[in-house]
């Protein structure tokens, strides 16, 4: 759906896997790098790119998006398939930050929230994960049961931003 200069589309991220490292996480980080070529993200950050991404998701939890997790990770982390639990969209366009400003209590200006930054936050009343993947592009994940509500809230905000001209 495109309204004004902003587009929202469903994002197929492939397999979504919650990884909760055991211990200090160093062995997990090495295993993740060896298995998938991805660094373990620091809090508030994401690593990788489309097709293979790792998002900080919470304290001692990351979300591997894309590949099926390598079996070697099971020795270093709790590995849980979350693929059917999340709805994922990409919000993009020159007014994307303005749309998010109407819905999310996070400063998404590019000087503050740079490419590769990620936040667990709220979109209105919905728990969400938002990651900046490009200059004007954001990956948004909400619980699957909230997919319709997310699209509705984004549409209302997109219409409001577009009406400003």
Across the structure, where does each feature detected by a protein language model lie?
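Basic, glycine/lysine-rich polyanion-binding surfaces/domains
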Residues: 1-165
């Amino acid at each position: 759906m495109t309204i004004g200069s902003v587009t929202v589309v469903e994002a197929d991220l492939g397999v979504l896997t919650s990884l909760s490292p055991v211990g200090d996480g160093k062995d997990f980080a090495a295993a993740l790098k060896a298995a998938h070529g991805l660094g373990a993200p620091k809090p508030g950050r994401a690593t990788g790119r489309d097709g293979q991404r790792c998002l900080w998701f919470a304290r001692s939890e990351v979300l591997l998006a894309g590949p099926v997790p390598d079996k070697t990770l099971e020795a270093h982390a709790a590995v849980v398939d979350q693929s059917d639990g999340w709805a994922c969209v990409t919000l993009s366009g020159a007014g994307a930050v303005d749309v998010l400003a109407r819905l999310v209590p996070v400063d998404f200006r590019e000087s503050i929230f740079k490419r590769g930054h990620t936040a667990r936050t709220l979109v209105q009343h919905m728990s969400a994960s938002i990651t900046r993947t490009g200059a004007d592009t954001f990956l948004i994940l909400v619980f699957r049961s909230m997919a319709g509500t997310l699209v509705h809230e984004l549409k209302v905000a997109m219409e409001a931003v577009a009406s400003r001209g």
